[in-house]
Swiss-Prot record:
GO terms for cellular component: cytosol. Catalyzes the synthesis of GMP from XMP. It comes from Xylella fastidiosa (strain M23). The gene is guaA. Residues 205-397 form the GMPS ATP-PPase domain. This is GMP synthase [glutamine-hydrolyzing].
Length: 522
């Protein structure tokens, strides 16, 4: 019998911190299901969610500012264990009768915390046992200056007298540091202590259980109907294909839409892997001309994303109309897409880019939705793929945007631009593999710049296109550093692109971090 993997769960109320999704990923790694909701979500839904504990995340606001997000009263009325992290601890303190103040100096980076009182959260945890100290990561400007009534100060640093607090009878805890980041050495142990020991959650959230659960859910949802899936060869759609093929077999039809904006040779690779190797029913549709016609004269990135998303659905509905049993459209939507598209009722959350799987779906879509990865983070999707038997090279492929090269060609998208870019990108990726650098960077790709640059080809003056190379290192894709690739490697890539591709005279390397830049150029 499949265990109820959602029975024991944690709710994270998001106050806008860059690390909030990381908290959720760490809890999932422990083996417990959790969700991230905006801090101002409706009280009725929060209380009916059935969480065994609530975490208040960090956030960029100051509790001393008028209108700052505040911990909701109904959370404290719930009798559930509560864990406030950074801003979450501060808003907990203020709401319950304590106080906060701005620190003389902001504290960012490594810090050493002295445990004063080893409550249930801290008991037995230490990086320096003889001193009962923890090495942690701080990122705050304000701090708690007075704990609420009945609370105990449990930890301090040389700079702040209240680095942690608790009220054991209520099972309320707060820490000023960030246990979710790897720099806090006992961070995962602290989260486990709260989730498993204090909240009493069982660790049922495993790849094997998720696969069993999703197979049962898919079978119950679709019955004998046919399901169609857009198969691109990316990680998400590949894992969905493998999972659905295992769940419903011949009821699954994968539709590979060649948009003309995919990676070089991707169509043949997709057909070889799924149709020939796995025995999945795959229909290949050449829709490149339709996409390029629809994108003609369109320069705005958001407009391009919407057009690509809407045309994607239109093509699928056309294919479904040929299949009388096709009632469902499967998609590779993953949990970060859902979180970032939800937003906050207060308007404090801002949409940076719409998501191909979430933001571009037309309201009149006639197919039902099947999204078996909707609850999963990317690292969970990869582990699921391995458990399903997919090749490592496919599962650990770098991310590729839903709109494809359409958002890596700046401005208007043309067929000749897409062909040049796909070839340049293929050269870059090939050289990364040859130099054993591919797995050392988190994401790498080429970008087509719609500007021409003067060059010399042979003895003649040339006026040709510019290709930008982008490679980043990141843990969570919320922040990223540009990858310091060796100069001789970049020289090799540049020479190959310029020599092998007619129409390119210059190659540049993007050395922008995130923030301020995003990883993708559009």
């Amino acid at each position: 019998m499949t265990p109820n993997i959602h029975h024991d769960k944690i709710l994270i109320l998001d106050f806008g911190a860059q690390y909030t999704q990381l908290i959720a990923r760490r809890i999932r790694e422990i083996g417990v299901y959790c969700e991230v909701w905006p801090w101002d979500h409706s009280p009725e839904e929060i209380l009916s969610f059935g969480a065994k504990g609530i975490i208040l995340s960090g956030g960029p606001e100051s509790t001393t500012s008028p209108g700052a997000p505040a911990a909701p009263q109904h959370v404290f009325d719930s009798d559930l264990p509560i864990f406030g992290i950074c801003y979450g601890m501060q808003t907990m303190a203020v709401h319950l009768g304590g106080a906060t103040e701005a620190a003389d100096k902001r504290e960012f980076g490594h810090a050493s915390v002295q445990v004063i009182y080893p409550d249930t959260l801290f008991s037995g945890l230490s990086d320096h046992p003889s001193e009962f100290r923890l090495d942690v990561w701080m990122s705050h400007g304000d701090h708690v200056s007075r704990v609420p009534p009945c609370f105990t100060i449990t930890a301090a640093t040389d700079r702040i007298p209240i680095a942690a607090m608790s009220r054991e009878d209520k099972r309320w805890y707060g820490v000023q540091f960030h246990p979710e980041v790897t720099h806090t050495l006992q961070g995962q142990a602290l989260l486990r202590r709260f989730v498993v020991d204090i909240c009493g959650c069982q660790t049922l959230w495993t790849s094997a259980n998720i696969i069993e659960d999703q197979i049962a859910r898919v079978r119950e949802r679709v019955g004998c109907d046919e399901v169609i899936l857009g198969l691109s060869g990316g990680v998400d759609s590949s894992v969905v294909a493998a999972l659905l093929h295992k769940a419903i077999g011949s009821q699954l039809t994968c539709v590979f839409v060649d948009t003309g904006m995919l990676r070089w040779g991707e169509g043949d690779q997709v057909m070889a892997m799924f149709a020939e190797h796995m025995g999945v029913n795959v229909v290949r549709i050449n829709a490149a001309s339709r996409y390029f016609d629809a994108l003609q004269g369109v320069y705005d990135p958001e407009a391009k994303r919407k057009i690509i998303g809407n045309l994607f659905i239109q093509i699928f509905e056309e294919e479904a109309s040929k299949r009388k049993q096709a009632k469902w459209l499967a998609q590779g939507t993953i949990y970060p897409d859902v979180i970032e598209s939800a937003g906050s009722k207060t308007g404090k959350a801002h949409v940076i880019k719409s998501h191909h799987n979430v933001g571009g779906l037309p309201e009149q879509m006639t197919l039902g939705m099947v999204e078996p990865l909707r609850e999963l983070f990317k690292d969970e999707v990869r582990r699921l793929g391995v458990a399903l038997g997919l090749p490592h090279a496919m599962v650990y492929r770098h991310p590729f945007p839903g709109p494809g090269l359409g958002v890596r060609i700046l401005g208007e998208v043309k067929p000749e631009y897409a062909e040049l870019l796909a070839k340049a990108d293929s050269i870059f990726i090939d050289e990364l593999h040859q130099a054993d650098l591919y797995d050392k960077v988190s994401q790498a790709f080429a970008v087509f710049l719609p500007v021409k640059s003067v060059g010399v080809v042979g003895d003649a003056r040339a006026y040709e296109w510019v290709i930008a190379l982008r490679a980043v290192e990141t843990v969570d894709f919320m922040t990223a550093h540009w990858a310091p690739l060796p100069y001789d490697f970049l020289s090799t890539v540049s020479n190959r692109i310029i020599n092998e591709l007619r129409g390119v005279s210059r190659v540049v390397y993007d050395i922008s971090g995130k923030p301020p830049a995003t990883i993708e150029w559009e």
